[in-house]
Amino acid sequence: RSMIEACGMTDLAYDHEHVGPALYNHPNDFACTMLPAPGKWNHPDYRTTIDTYADYRRALRIVKVVSGNRNLRRPFTYEEICNALEHKSVINPILCIPSVSKGHGTGHLRRCLNLAIKNLADVYIPTDANLSELDSLVEKMEMEGLEKWQIISEFPTSKEYSLIITDYFSIPKQLIKDLSTLSPVASIDEGSSFTQYCDYLLDIIPSAKLNRVANLSNPGFIPLPKTRKSKDDALVENNKVLVSIGGEDPANLSLPISIALAECNKNVTVISANPLELRKQIPDDLLKNIRIVPPVNNLKERLYMYDIVVTHYGFTAFEALAAGCGVLLMETTSLHGVLAHKYGFALL
């Protein structure tokens, strides 16, 4: 009854939205007794109201932290909610920004999507992204735990995220300049000359000479395979060859190298984003030596099955070495060629 009366006594939007103030802000009309909540309910520093889109996304993280991959049909307990509010992803949300432009390969996007799954981070993919494998790769990662809401297409606002991570190879000046005004920025393997806008530089893949010093350079962060060749396996003839020149193969080298290897009587497995299209371009007499497969999930754990891995300079090259394979690199760009030569890889 008091609430009904209060509704007709105020025109203030704040009173109507929050309800309670319509009572306790008008002591001449209503008597309110403020009782302290029991300790387990009394957390004045926690905020669970949703007033902005950022608040909504924060609530989604809370739900994900509590429920994990389960579809809970019961109310959350206060302990679960309080514990979730202390989770790192809720306190300090992270945004990953990969390169999603045609010709840059899929490695940058893969790395950011994996970071998002493991750290409940968001991934910024603009609406004009033209990476051909974008949709299929995101769908595959959704099967591994990525939530649809973790992909955002709107540019972040100031202080919306505690940290922005870029994985761009060579980020445009205006983009990194804009990001630096919104949040601290950490850049992975950044090759541009605009690193003065970055707060932290992490170099993982050994690079060509750069006119700057990273905060940390450590190839130990390359995710090496657990499954490796035995010494006996390493002594067999080099007949089984894997061709994997990036998820995008921007230089279209998979076809000619596969044909050349098949002509040398090698048993070739080639990874292609468009297996049927690639198959049409292979001479009929060579099809018996060439097997075409779509992108392989967790490829690094299958590299040991091959004697030689043909790829370009990047994670797969180091993973193949660790797996005990012979490695042959293709010069997909001049920079890839320089890097392959600098670090002692066999190069075509």
What are these regions (language model features)?
Residues 1-47, 57-68:
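Conserved core of the sugar-phosphate nucleotidyltransferase
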Residues 77-79, 197-252, 273-274, 278:
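A nucleotide-sugar donor-handling region in carbohydrate enzymes
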Residues 96-118, 127-215:
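Active-site and donor-binding regions of nucleotide-sugar-utilizing enzymes
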Residues 113, 303, 321-322:
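Short alpha-helix at the nucleotide-sugar/activated-sugar donor binding site of glycosyltransferases
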Residues 122-130, 269-274:
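Short internal beta-strands
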Residues 239-306:
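Donor-nucleotide binding loops and adjacent catalytic segments primarily
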Residues 304-315, 325-326:
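Acidic donor-binding loop of glycosyltransferase active sites
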Residues 317-348:
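Catalytic binding pocket for nucleotide-activated donors in carbohydrate/polymer assembly enzymes
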